[in-house]
Amino acid sequence: MSTKDAHDPFATPLETITHDPLAETAGLKADYDKRAYGEANPALMGTLEKDDMANRPIDAVEEVPTTSIRKWWVRLTWFTTWWIPSFVLSKCGGMKRPDVQMAWREKFTICAIIFWLCAIILFYIIAFGRLLCPDYDKAWNLSQLSQHAGENDYYAAVRGTVYDFSKFYKGDHSDITNLQTSSDLMLQLAGQDLTGYFPVPLSVGCQSLVSDTSLALMPTANNTPLISQAIHTSGPLQGDTSSKLHDINWYPDRFLPFVKKLRKGYYVYSKKDLANQGQWRNWAVIHGKVYDLSNYLNTVSTYQTNPAYSFLDSSIVSLFKSQAGSDITADFEDAMSTFNQTYRGATQACLDNVFYVGRTDFRDTARCEVQNYLLLAFSVLLVTTVLAKFIAALQLGTKRSPEQQDKFVICQVPCYTEGEEELRKTIDSLAGLEYDDKRKLLFLICDGMIVGSGNDRSTPRIVLDILGVDPKIDPEPLMFKSVAEGSKQLNYAKVYSGLYEFEGHVVPYIVVVKVGRPSERSRPGNRGKRDSQILLMRYLNRVHFDAPMFPLELEIYHQMKNVIGIDPAFYEYILMVDADTRVEADGLNRLVANCADDSSIIAICGETTLDNAEGSWWTMIQVYEYYISHHLSKAFESLFGSVTCLPGCFSLYRIRSSDKGRPLFISNRIIDDYSENRVDTLHKKNLLHLGEDRYLTTLVLKNFPSFRTKFVPDAKALTSAPDRFGVLLSQRRRWINSTVHNLAELVLMPELCGFCLFSMRFIVFIDLLGTVILPATAVYLVYLIVTVATKSAPIPYISIAMIAAVYGLQAILFLLKRQWQYIGWLVIYILAYPVFSFFLPIYSFWHMDDFSWGNTRIVVGEKGNKKIVAGTDDEPYDDTMIPLKRFSEYQREVWEEEAAAPSMRSGMTGASGPFGNSQAILHSGPPSVYRAGGSAYAGSVAGSDYGAGLGDYYQNTNVLQKPAHSRQTSAAALSQMGGSQAASMMFGTGTPSVYGMAGMGSMYGMPGSSASMYGLPNPMMNTTASMYGLPPMLANPLGANHSPAHSDIGVSMPVSQQNTGGSHIWAQPPEAATVAANSGRGSGMQARPVSTLSALNATNPFGVTAVARALAVNEASDPTDEEIKSAVQTYLANQPSLMNVTKRSVREALVAAFPNAELSYKKSMINKAIDDTLSGGAQA
């Protein structure tokens, strides 16, 4: 057995297979590509796989190391859910598998953490302050009391207590003859301290100290009541004996019991007010209570000869005189300690009953203030963050107009279940971009043979019909490894390529259709969006490193390099666009221009708005959210160069660095992390299955922290938002859960810029906290509205200020940007706020484990390393099933083997397989067979006879019958007129141009036989060219000729128009040259197409293979300016193409030519010499 066979799992000869599962299709003739599939027929792949894996132990236990964070999380999970037995989850919850049960436990733990976090926050904001300061909302000072002076809000204070007289003051409650009260008179007293209007008889208030009922205090001028008829004098001093006030016990027996029902709280004084009024009031603080002896001292002073008025001890009175407005508690206790218990009690009762006027404002104490200060600190922090985001978004100025860029860009579009209208909109918008058509490639990946809801065809068929691909084109599926578990890692896909014309734009495209294994029945080929992204990323990575490739990747390489005519290594950027997104015409150019200006940008995104804003109520509530999420969050993060969420619907990634060509987006680090197959934990499920686009951004930031991710508001795209609540619910479930898990990853990432609170990690933490407490925010807002509406508590000015700051700054933002329509969208968004902040998060958190769990691996242990056992119901898979080969080796083998090998179909020299003849379509039938219903668009190699045996390859191919013909090549349909392009446009024949010019060369007017599409003749190369006019991919490098009568493409190709030399990037094997010389000119067969990077000339912008002669070394240490200018002219004159020459490369060449000279200070002179030479101003 050869070395190749030893490593080839499909080396089993077909003769050893006794059963043909497709024997009923024996009448159909087709063959398969052994180089792409190995030695096995793809239709029998399932049988061969099982035979190959028969000796492998299927129940082998695989140990996966567990991180310390994972171990601690598992402990916390079990600590939280220990009281829920596993058999309950199995019996009641239907969760039979341990990994599903563990995910439910993790979900429950996360929901419990979120619940307690929300509860703690609500408790702290609403209830914690009440526990620390129970009567915080039951105290009023003079200014606060004066606010309750309305007809329906009538508050007043009497002896340190606030009462609500709103339901009392309107009635006539006077029983004094000829004295009536009115509501107007009563309103004059609202919101005031009415202590002076309710004097207490001294014989009642100070029973043990005063016995004379005729004694009364004389108020000072400042304490004299202004409305005399409102004074409630009781006892013998009341002149009207018929009034109830004549009763000396009216105050304690009638008044106090009545107002007790109206009590609201305390009347308080601040220490500042006490000190200020202490200049004219003799009051002081004792044990937090305020006593006012001003009227007493005024009375004593007035009646100095009557000792009955001096009923208080002089030691007590002297304290009020000497320390007015101060706290005299200590001195008061010292004075009271000299009294006996009876006199001490009588004195204290007298002070409380007659001279008590209120309390010190306890709300100013540390116990009551600590919560407010903490809330204020958090509020300032949040408002500062919002203000910073506002300033970041406030980028006023004129809209920039960058120059047209010339970088090569791949526009990747993953397609799943979208409808024809959405797909056409996306494809047309990309084709119509104001960007050089030759430098953009539409790369569409159809994720499985899926028929979307409401579609009458599968998604791949819709895509191919839009592009104009002939339904008869049926390429053979090729193997590649998918991102999946178990046997689903083996996948098959078909490749189509061609040109798509839209409104004058002619853009190349490649369509990859994942079709799956032959045994797949449910959603064949579908592996998810992440697999589609990895497919392209891994392919470009292998192109960059010239690494061994899967058969599918080899075919894509061939299609890009030999059919489309552009080396895949030329592409510098990947534009990722969803299949329901429409990019504005200048969007791509703006993104590329920003990346070209700043080489440190690794990824960039633009603004995404809604294309169906007024589609339904559910779309309208999303308009404002989309706008703010871009212009606040992303604009702010962009200032730090750390946009944490680049939307998958419209983002541009840099493939390699601009200085040294290091792989960036296609680096092994990103691909290895992003292509994780074992997604068996809740965290990984949310990262890789729900939020793959966001996690991709996280990986970019994690692996390349020195590079920047940016947001450009000028680049715009429009996407379709969910217009039904069910779809919105599903989308937000994915978004919210993936946001939580991705932010948790970013919080642990020390590479983010900044330090401590001044860092992106802190901003990420704030975003994470804000996401998980969204339900608490909604509940608090409801509480706030109810509190303010019912006036059951003081107005929370801090909370209202925060809300005003958040939405006020947002309103200022779109008003300054003159986006007036967002005023209405803001109102709609506020109305729908409960949906976004409460219902959707609650639903999302509880359905965090809502996945489709595979059955390939079952977790059997969580202690130490995780042990995983392969499921016995899964088909076996091993990486050795898929052959790998470098493109250069593969191509060299093709040249060596097929140049001399007879074709299975016609016996003529040529190549079959993915790199077979791209021009000749070998068939024994007449040429007319290939002219009917043709298309100008090509797939990869066809899997069945052209026009016969159509349908599914696995169903319609008899793989055991010896094939009589070689399969068609990928350019089979280029011979026909179909879609939007004619065959003559593709092959540069001598036929008249469809644009009315003399004759067609290449598609874009590069080297051709005559005038190109754009009228650029090329006298240097008298041959046909590639799709883009590069060296002729469809020319005959071996000198073969096609006769007009029997030309496979139905056009005349004179010998003079064919390249008999065949310059190409690969050295032509001597064997191929010999065969070419002996093949004859009438064989009707062309050999391998030549490279797109050959036969360079001045009009070939892509030619880079010709090597320019190096400048002669000059040992002078101080060369003259003339010598330098001469060297510049010589270097530029030796360049085969100036398209890839930069000023920097010229300067580097000069540094090498003058090794002993210091040329850095002559940079400006060198640049001027370059400009003069290119403009023709320099003299040779």
Swiss-Prot record:
Q: What is its EC number?
A: 2.4.1.16
Residues in DEK-C domain copies: 1118-1175
Q: How does it sit in the membrane?
A: Multi-pass membrane protein
InterPro entries, alphabetized = Chitin_synth (IPR004835), Cyt_B5-like_heme/steroid-bd (IPR001199), Cyt_B5-like_heme/steroid_sf (IPR036400), DEK_C (IPR014876), Nucleotide-diphossugar_trans (IPR029044)
Mention any Pfam family matching this sequence: Cyt-b5
Task: Give the UniProt keywords, A-Z.
Answer: Cell membrane, Cell wall biogenesis/degradation, Cytoplasmic vesicle, Glycoprotein, Glycosyltransferase, Membrane, Transferase, Transmembrane, Transmembrane helix
Transmembrane recorded as keyword: yes
| Result of knocking out the encoding gene | Does not effect the dimorphic transition in vitro, mating, nor growth rate. Leads to important alterations in cell morphology, particularly at the mycelial stage, and in the staining pattern with calcofluor white. Reduces levels of chitin synthase activity and subsequent chitin content. Almost completely abolishes virulence to maize.
This entry carries the following GO cellular component terms, namely:
cell periphery; cell septum; cytoplasmic vesicle membrane; plasma membrane
- Protein family (similarity comment): Belongs to the chitin synthase family. Class V subfamily.
Query: PANTHER family under this entry?
Result: CHITIN SYNTHASE
General function of this protein: Polymerizes chitin, a structural polymer of the cell wall and septum, by transferring the sugar moiety of UDP-GlcNAc to the non-reducing end of the growing chitin polymer. Plays a crucial role during infection and allows the fungus to overcome the resistance of the plant that checks growth of the pathogen and eventually eliminates it.
> What is this protein called in UniProt?
Chitin synthase 6
Tell me the gene name.
Answer: CHS6
